[in-house]
A protein has these predicted regions:
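TPR alpha-solenoid repeat register
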Residues: 19, 36, 52-53
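Cys/His-clustered metal-coordination modules, chiefly Zn-binding fingers
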Residues: 116-205
Length: 205
């Protein structure tokens, strides 16, 4: 029903960007990825930056196809993940493949890891050190830049049941959600999910 209403609105006003974005969400829910890729072409013609989203939707289209799991993976890994944090996150979340993704785009997923990696990166190093996944002998005199990680490390060292709690804020409409989103469920924008974390001391943890 929503699809029919939006298509009618676009017949009356074909350059209605908001209606196109709403239709994009409807298509996503219906898993009509090919139609969505065509729709992104319309948004591009109207001046919208859709390059990253287009690659992301290609990944969803491959995932929904009748290809074998290995073929799906092969096609998805050929997509352009550089400078595309959402596609990079998708690859890590789906296949657990590290492609030097930005820490800020996958930190909540990293929280579930039980082995440290990419320690040449300061953010990764501090994070895994705070979680106790790096031996203290390997990291003497750590100078934390991230105050949350420093607090987490201190609390854990003093036998507090400290943890990180995550929430997700849309940088466009400022809505805060309890779960990660690739498209904001409120304003429908892509790649606007900012992962927020804070230290909590939870004795029931």
């Amino acid at each position: 029903r929503a699809k029919e209403v939006l298509l009618q609105a676009l017949k009356l006003r074909p350059r209605n960007i908001q209606a196109l974005k709403l239709l994009k969400i409807v298509y996503l829910k219906l898993r009509k990825y090919k139609e969505n890729l065509e729709l992104l072409g319309c948004l591009f013609e109207l001046g919208e930056n859709v390059k990253e989203e287009k690659e992301f939707l290609k990944a969803l289209d491959f995932l929904a196809s009748s290809l074998s799991d290995e073929e799906k993976k092969e096609h998805i890994l050929k997509l352009q993940t550089d400078n595309n944090p959402m596609l990079g996150r998708f690859v890590f979340e789906k296949y657990h493949i590290f492609l030097n993704q930005d820490f800020s785009s996958i930190c909540d997923l990293l929280y579930k890891e039980n082995k440290a990696f990419n320690l040449q990166n300061k953010e990764y190093f501090e994070f895994f050190y705070a979680l106790g996944l790096i031996e203290d002998e390997e990291s003497k005199d750590v100078n934390f830049k991230n105050s949350n990680f420093k607090m987490l490390k201190i609390l854990k060292e003093n036998s507090f049941k400290a943890r990180l709690e995550f929430s997700y804020r849309c940088t466009e409409c400022k809505s805060v959600m309890p779960l990660f989103f690739y498209h904001c469920p409120v304003c429908y924008e892509f790649n606007t999910c900012q992962i927020i974390y804070e230290v909590k001391n939870n004795e029931t943890y």
